[in-house]
Amino acid sequence: QVDVDAGQPAVNAVVNSHALTGKVMCGYQGWFTCSEDGGELGWTHWARAIHRPFGPGNAAVDLWPDMQEFSQDERYPTDFKHADGRPAAVYSSANKKTISRHFRWMRDYGIDGIFLQRFANELHSARLKAQKDVVLFHVRDAALETGRVFAVMYDLSGLRKGQVASAGNDWKQLMHDGVTKGSRYLHHNGKPLVAVWGVGFSDDRDYTLAECGDLIDVLKSEGCAVMLGVPSWWREQERDAVSDKSLHDVLKKADVLSPWTIGRYRSLHEASLHARRVWKPDLDLSLIHI
């Protein structure tokens, strides 16, 4: 076993799971299902009408996955056709072999690990929760197989007021089930790291900052380090961030902040400007509160 120093390529080495620092991490949604994968969830996230055939006029994706490396038992035929008349196939996140393949790609191309998205607004459904659990177990096994790391990320999008606590209850169950006990679960500052995405955004979310603060307290009480997915302008409390004096008090509870920057810049020059005008002052403020 070889520990990878912070910032070094992870190809063909076992990534250390002791800290987030210096790692290349990706979000992993694991939300694609197919009608014949055994989960009875239809073509989730492939098709607009998930229980109708996935074919022309019923697609929810903009791009088609490159299926060249997938084995036959990972291919789920659709109603789309290749030019030669063969049915075009896609993959399912419920297939253990496919998740293992994704993790091998991560190993081969220097990605250290993933934050597995766990959408909190679907945890009330036994069927949807079961699918998420299957993906989680496959991710855990694939990380062990390939020397990658993983951590759970709760996405609060879609929750109504009073529902945020469901994420804390779910996490307690996962802790009881031992999800953080394996060698591949990512830790930070000596604690298992759990992420919560969707804190402080100005897009009319129904749940409250107080609920988010309570959730952080619950996760901390379980002995975890907490990462928050926050708006780009959380520090200034403008544009994509709520203007609320309690926002910074909630964010101070966290160990790591991860600003959402999708669409905030469109070129390397704009990225450099964003880093200088936004990230540098963000970092300066954050360092005060370490």
What is the meaning of each model-derived region?
Residues H248-S286:
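Long, well-ordered mid-to-C-terminal structural blocks that present hydrophobic/aromatic surfaces
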Residues E36, L144-I262:
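Active-site region of glycoside hydrolase catalytic domains
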Residues M106, A143, L219, L283-D284:
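A generic structural signal for well-ordered alpha-helical segments
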Residues P9-A13, A94-H102, K132-V139, N169-G182, ...:
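Alpha-helical scaffolding within the catalytic cores
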Residues K81-N95, F115-A130, V152-A165, P192-D206, ...:
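The substrate-binding groove and active-site-proximal loops of carbohydrate-active enzymes
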Residues K23, G27-K129, D133, H138:
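N-terminal carbohydrate-binding/catalytic regions of secreted carbohydrate-active enzymes
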Residues I288-I290:
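Conserved small/polar residues in nucleotide/adenosyl-binding loops
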Residues Q1-K23:
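Mature N-terminal, pre-catalytic/accessory segment of carbohydrate-active enzymes
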